[in-house]
Swiss-Prot record:
Compositionally biased spans, kind Basic and acidic residues: 145-156
Swiss-Prot/TrEMBL keywords: Activator, Cytoplasm, Exonuclease, Hydrolase, Leucine-rich repeat, Magnesium, Metal-binding, Nuclease, Nucleus, Repeat, Repressor, RNA-binding, Transcription, Transcription regulation
One of the record's GO cellular component terms: CCR4-NOT complex
UniProt feature, compositional bias: Low complexity: 110-144
Compartments (UniProt record): Cytoplasm; Nucleus
Species annotation: Schizosaccharomyces pombe (strain 972 / ATCC 24843)
Catalyzed reaction equations: Exonucleolytic cleavage of poly(A) to 5'-AMP
Name this protein carries in UniProt: CCR4-Not complex 3'-5'-exoribonuclease subunit Ccr4
Function: Acts as a catalytic component of the CCR4-NOT core complex, which in the nucleus seems to be a general transcription factor, and in the cytoplasm the major mRNA deadenylase involved in mRNA turnover. Ccr4 has 3'-5' RNase activity with a strong preference for polyadenylated substrates and also low exonuclease activity towards single-stranded DNA. Participates in the shortening of poly(A)-tails.
Cofactor requirements of the protein: Mg(2+)
Region (Disordered): 110-156
Length: 690
């Protein structure tokens, strides 16, 4: 019976070789580590580990040895038997919940390191024949097919994730093998391979790669794209150089390289600081590749409709050449651009969270200049930034943006209330900037979700969930009330940063529901505020707002919510049911008794466009969690900044990097304020025939 997560790549009809018991296996490893040869004081501990692991690796030279061990154990266990087999060491641990041990003797926090034996599976070659593992193959390659169409593969259950092609004399590996992107462990050790194809970079889920005992001369740089890798064993090959691109393998625990004609610079680094030290050195020393092409601009209306703002063009980086003080036509007075950007707060940008980023590219001194180049280059009329701390707002953003003609508003998160002056300087929050040549501000305010006015409403019951889940979070939103100096049109801008943790989806929904309640109150108040601009200074006729729903509203920021989430559904549809799954069966009084709704006709600027597939790009997550929402009855989106070039992304594991200063990318949209249409006069033609 074969392992359901593990296949040897063949059907082996013969008797399986004997296997070591766990005690004998561990004893064999310890005997190598404690051998007199390794007690030489001139050998570093890191290199002793290399020698010990290389010796262990050489014991796995038989055809499909790891798969045979797993299959033999499964057969001996009988029906229903389940036991964990560690393919790296050949050892077994009893019980279905035992964790797989790495060759380092530690544990990986991933299910892929443990193989549970319950059912059988087979894998045929593309020719439809079965390889006989009793003799070594001499074919030029072994091609492996999925045996399923793309439509069927989506429904196919993957009962194995490990593949053992070790010790069978392979000379080449077919690129079809790398279509198995679900693989977590690949063993191609002790063959006759001379190269690893660059297509290996497609195995994004690979945790362990063993290509020891071959004649490989070079490591493909594409291996650096496999950020899930914990072990790469390349013992006994012909490798002399380790490509700097492997510096992105921030989770790599062991790079087995003993038995290679390695250049001294790499060998010395491993001897001194081990795999972690080598990877860090490679990461910081990796040459910076060419920058990506400029992000394009998507026009959503025709040129005949005067769609392009003086400050927006299809060559978006040319925005700095635009004259922001240039007189505008009447229709262009109604146009403006807005940016939303989570800039990644200085204290959040740590090597622990962003281990794939060079330390110099992670430093605030480097990133802040890139951020400011983006802000100046895109030249938006309104800019909403998240994760801006007090210190950098006061000393960097506010002064720099003032020189560019902006005025700013900043509020830190609620925790600042409990801190002294030194501590509060590093608390981040939301900052909104607007061009003083175009807007005047009526009012600014902050919504603190742990003490929002919505919590004091009589119909809101403060349940234990509200106290323990919502009011313990210190997220905020910043609202600014703006008036256009040229036409008197009003605009409400909400700059939001919603809670991040997916385990608190309910909190996200509650926060956004509170936000919409507050915006309704603010819009009602703003509608009745007197204008700050005398009528004789206006170039256009001042608009009127007979009801608060007529005022243009923009809600921008990092919502930490993708399309289809409760937050997205609530904003786009105008309501959320009391039993929505994102409430997570928690009691929030009125929210979970009758659901919640808002009266605004909100649309996502990027919602119906294919211009942007993600706003957050890291090895563990790629998705659109930042949004620009607008009131469709009063605003029309006329243009959008497109996403990052796909060819560039194919060689990037995540942001930030040398070209992108945050793990988020900025959103930029152009809007046009809709004008109330004057009713057509009634027809004076007399169609009555008498």
């Amino acid at each position: 019976m074969f392992n359901p997560r593990y296949t040897q790549g063949t059907i082996y009809p013969g008797a399986h070789p004997g296997l070591l018991t766990p005690d004998h296996q561990h004893a064999a490893i310890l005997s190598v580590q404690n051998s007199p040869a390794l007690e030489n004081s001139n050998i570093s501990e890191h290199w002793k580990q290399q020698i010990a692991l290389a010796t262990q690796s050489r014991s796995f030279s038989s055809p499909h040895q790891r798969a045979h061990n797993a299959a033999a154990l499964a057969r001996s266990g009988g029906p229903g038997f389940s036991m964990n087999y560690n393919a790296r060491t050949g050892a077994f641990t009893g019980g279905p919940n035992a964790a797989g041990l790495s060759s380092l003797g530690g544990k990986y926090n991933t299910s892929s390191t443990t193989t549970t034996l319950t059912t059988s599976t087979t894998l045929n070659t593309s020719s439809g024949t079965t390889l006989n593992s009793t003799s070594k193959t001499t074919t030029s390659s072994v091609a492996v097919d999925d045996q399923k169409s793309k439509s069927d593969s989506k429904k196919e259950r993957r009962d194995w994730t490990c593949l053992d092609l070790g010790g069978i004399g392979l000379r080449n590996v077919s690129t079809d093998l790398f279509k198995f992107s679900f693989l977590t462990e690949l063993y191609i050790n002790h063959n006759n391979l001379t190269r690893l194809p660059p297509e290996i970079g497609k195995l994004k889920n690979l945790v362990i790669l063993d290509a020891s005992g071959n004649s490989i001369k070079t490591i493909p740089p594409e291996l650096g794209l496999l950020t899930e890798l914990r072990e790469v064993l390349l013992f006994d090959n012909m490798i002399s150089v380790i490509p700097a691109e492997l510096g992105t393998l921030f989770q790599l625990k062991i790079l087995g390289i003993e038995g290679n004609p390695l250049q001294d610079v790499y060998k010395n680094q491993i001897m001194e600081s081990g795999t972690a030290g080598l990877i860090a050195a490679l990461r910081d020393g990796c040459p910076v590749g060419p920058p990506p092409p400029e992000r394009g601009w998507e026009k959503l209306v025709s040129d005949d409709d005067d769609d392009v703002n003086d400050n927006v063009s299809t060559s978006v980086r040319d925005l700095t050449a635009a004259d922001s003080n240039k007189p505008s036509t009447t229709s262009k007075n109604l146009k403006f651009t807005i940016m939303s950007y989570n800039v990644l707060c200085e204290r959040y940008a740590t090597s622990t969270l962003y281990g794939y980023t060079p330390s110099w590219a992670l430093s605030w001194s480097y990133r802040k200049d890139l951020i400011m180049q983006e802000l100046g280059g895109y030249n938006a009329d309104i800019i909403c930034l998240q994760e801006v701390d007090v210190e950098n707002y006061d000393t960097f953003f506010a002064p720099q943006m003032s020189l560019k003609g902006y005025k700013g508003v900043h509020f830190p998160k609620s925790r600042v209330r409990t801190m002294n002056e030194v501590e509060r300087r590093i608390v981040d929050g939301c900052a909104t900037f607007f061009k003083t040549s175009k807007y005047v501000m009526h009012e600014k305010m902050v919504i603190e979700y742990n003490q929002a006015p919505s919590l004091r409403r009589q119909d809101i019951k403060l349940t234990s969930n509200m106290y323990n889940r919502v009011m313990t979070k210190d997220n905020i939103s910043v609202i600014t009330l703006l008036e256009n100096k040229e036409n008197g049109s009003r605009l409400i801008v909400a700059n939001c940063h919603i809670h991040w943790d997916p385990q608190f989806r309910d909190v996200k929904v509650i926060q956004v529901a509170m936000l919409m309640d507050e915006i309704a109150q603010v819009a009602t108040k703003f509608r009745n505020m007197p204008s700050k601009i005398p009528s004789d200074q206006l170039k256009d006729e001042r608009p009127t707002y007979p009801e608060y729903l007529k005022i243009p509203i923009l809600i921008c920021g990092d919502f930490n919510s993708v399309q289809g989430s409760g937050v997205y559904d609530f904003l786009s549809s105008g309501s959320i049911s009391q039993n929505h799954e994102d409430f997570m069966n928690n009691d929030y009084g009125e929210y979970t008794v009758n659901g919640r709704s808002h009266a605004f006709n909100l649309k996502s600027a990027y919602g119906e466009s294919e211009a942007l597939s993600f706003t957050n790009y890291t090895p563990g997550f790629k998705g659109a969690i930042d949004h620009i929402w607008y009131t469709g009855n009063s605003l029309e989106v006329t243009g959008l900044l497109k996403g990052v070039d796909k060819d560039y992304l194919s060689g990037v594991v995540g942001f930030p990097n040398a070209h992108f200063p945050s793990d988020h990318i900025c959103l930029l949209a152009e809007f046009k304020v809709k004008q109330e249409k004057t009713p057509l006069p009634s027809s004076k033609f007399n169609n009555d025939k008498k």
